UniProtKB/Swiss-Prot annotation:
Stored InterPro entries: Chorion
Record region (Right arm): 27-37
Keywords on record: Repeat
GO terms of molecular function: structural constituent of egg chorion
Aminoacyl-tRNA synthetase keyword on record: no
Chain's role: This protein is one of many from the eggshell of the silk moth.
Protein name listed in UniProt: Chorion class CB protein PCH12
Region (Central domain): 1-26
Residue ranges crossing the lipid bilayer per the database entry: none
Cellular component annotations (GO), alphabetically ordered: egg chorion
Repeat found in the keyword field: yes
GO biological process: chorion-containing eggshell formation
Protein family membership: Belongs to the chorion protein family.
Length: 37
């Protein structure tokens, strides 16, 4: 499961398998956060 706040927010939590989806859905900055995908 992934928790996605409004687009442009800094903090983004990724769930297993949702990492790639989160990176695409959120701003590029999200890719720098912890991504256990």
């Amino acid at each position: 499961d992934g928790i996605f706040p409004t687009v442009g927010a800094g903090d983004v939590w990724y769930g297993c398998g949702d990492g790639a989806v989160g990176i695409v859905a959120e701003t590029p900055f999200a890719s720098t956060t912890t991504n256990p995908a």
